[in-house]
């Protein structure tokens, strides 16, 4: 579309394109709601539209290391902010995109035959994904759903109980990175996209093939080349099986009860 063409030609920055698309989605969602409420049909063509991630090789210092990830998650825990902790963890441990997190519904959460919680992602480009949630994260998610009394619909909402938007999650993350950078617990400010880059890098360094990671995260294989520099430098010197980033469910339980 025209946004991608402008980004590729250098006439528009990637971040500006993302913001413009977000605005268009919000406007069309309003029009759709208004039109349907007045008994007419409206096709929201922007509902499933998204911009591809920037196609470039990431430098070795582009992503947070294991200590920085721990500092971020610990800050959310210390603030008793279970929603922030869960949102950050879904990116870091499962590589979900910002948009996917905002679009999560309770109906997508299910159990497989072995009793593990899973996310049945809706089809995108005619491709479905069935993602097993790590046990520690599954415990936290289950606790969160019960504590928030979520019966159906959006898993994450704003203070007005409307579905959270991508700019809301970015602001939420920024509220933590601002403090952590000042406290020298982060090297720089990170975005939701940066956290996803870290998640994918962990998967690749843990031995998963580019095709396997691409399939799991819902992107095309060509995007995997952007992580070559990070993998070669091996700045995150741990296995990328996400069990290496352990989460303590007992502390979450304590926070919810408080």
Show where each model-derived region lies.
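N-terminal core-binding DNA-recognition domain of tyrosine recombinases/integrases
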Residues: 1-58
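DNA breakage-rejoining catalytic core of tyrosine-based enzymes
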Residues: 53-70, 125-135, 150-152
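Basic, Lys/Arg- and aromatic-enriched nucleic-acid-binding interface segment
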Residues: 68-98
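A short, basic/aromatic helix-end/turn motif that makes direct DNA contacts
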Residues: 103-109, 214-221, 229-236
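Active-site/catalytic core of tyrosine-dependent DNA strand-transfer enzymes
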Residues: 134-186
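DNA/chromatin major-groove-contacting recognition/catalytic segments
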Residues: 226-258
């Amino acid at each position: 579309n025209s946004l991608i063409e402008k980004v590729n030609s250098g006439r528009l920055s990637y971040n500006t394109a993302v913001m413009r698309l977000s605005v268009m989605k919000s406007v069309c969602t309003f029009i759709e709601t208004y039109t349907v409420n007045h008994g007419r049909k409206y096709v929201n063509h922007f509902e499933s539209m998204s911009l591809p991630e920037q196609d470039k090789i990431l430098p070795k210092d582009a992503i947070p290391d294991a200590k920085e990830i721990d500092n971020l998650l610990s800050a959310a825990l210390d603030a008793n902010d279970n929603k922030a902790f869960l949102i950050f963890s879904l990116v870091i441990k499962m590589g979900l995109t910002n948009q996917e997190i905002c679009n999560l519904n309770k109906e997508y959460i299910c159990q497989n035959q072995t009793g593990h919680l899973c996310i049945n992602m809706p089809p995108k480009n005619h491709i479905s994904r069935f993602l097993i949630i790590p046990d520690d994260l599954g415990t936290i998610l289950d606790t969160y759903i019960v504590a928030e009394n979520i019966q159906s619909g959006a898993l994450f909402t704003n203070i007005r109980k409307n579905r959270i938007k991508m700019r809301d999650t970015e602001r939420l993350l920024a509220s933590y990175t601002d403090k952590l950078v000042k406290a020298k617990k982060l090297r720089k400010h990170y975005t939701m996209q940066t956290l996803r880059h870290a998640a994918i890098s962990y998967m690749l360094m843990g031995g998963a093939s580019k095709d396997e990671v691409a399939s799991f995260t819902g992107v095309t294989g060509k995007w995997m080349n952007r992580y070559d520099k990070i993998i070669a430098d091996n700045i995150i010197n741990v296995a990328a099986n996400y069990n290496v980033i352990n989460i303590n469910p007992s502390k979450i339980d304590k926070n919810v009860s408080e």
